[in-house]
């Protein structure tokens, strides 16, 4: 049975055995991150509508490039639950393990959202489907709350 996060104007489902962390960032922006028992994580940051989704995705990519030498990034545009997302698929090494991550950003209902997810490649085949389900559950419910 999935757990449900329903706070801060967003709703999404996540596996009940994952750990959830809410944080307030600079400027009153918020982020919610959910961690798997194996260390994979999925995060959503909520920004003002004035934040440009393409710039948010690029800023996240720039931060990752500073952290991980040799990071490979592929631009991606996709539609999920009727929302247009822009971002990047990432591959990089960390502690001698290959990792896959994704950055997605969108503007909806007067707010800009940035979604970030990351897992080691050996678990990504399974965890990637969980990330996808969490993203769909978030985007499906955008605009339903006022």
Model-derived features with residue positions:
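Surface-exposed amphipathic alpha-helical segments
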Residues: 18, 114-146
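Short, surface-exposed beta-strand/loop "edge" segments at domain boundaries and coil↔beta transitions
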Residues: 39-44, 51-52, 96-99, 122-126
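Hydrophobic residues embedded in beta-strands of well-ordered beta-sheets
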Residues: 30, 112-113
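Secretory pathway targeting signatures of secreted, lumenal, and periplasmic proteins
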Residues: 2-58, 62
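Short beta-strand segments enriched in hydrophobic/aromatic residues
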Residues: 48, 92, 118-119
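Signature of long, low-cysteine stretches enriched in small and polar/charged residues
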Residues: 61-110, 132
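Short secondary-structure junctions
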Residues: 4, 17-24, 65-79, 141
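Surface-exposed flexible segments
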Residues: 50-63, 125-137
């Amino acid at each position: 049975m999935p757990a449900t996060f329903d706070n801060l104007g967003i709703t999404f489902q996540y596996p009940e055995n994952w750990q959830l962390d809410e944080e307030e960032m600079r400027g009153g922006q918020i982020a919610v991150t959910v961690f798997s028992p194996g260390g994979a994580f999925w995060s959503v940051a909520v920004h003002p509508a004035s934040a440009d989704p393409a710039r948010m995705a690029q800023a996240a990519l720039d931060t990752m490039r500073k952290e991980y030498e040799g990071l490979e990034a592929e631009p991606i545009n996709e539609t999920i639950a009727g929302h247009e997302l822009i971002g990047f698929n990432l591959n990089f090494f960390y502690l001698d393990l290959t990792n896959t991550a994704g950055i997605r950003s969108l503007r909806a209902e007067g707010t800009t959202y940035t979604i970030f997810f990351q897992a080691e490649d050996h678990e990504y085949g399974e965890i990637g489907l969980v990330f996808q389900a969490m993203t769909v559950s978030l985007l499906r419910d955008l605009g339903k709350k006022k």
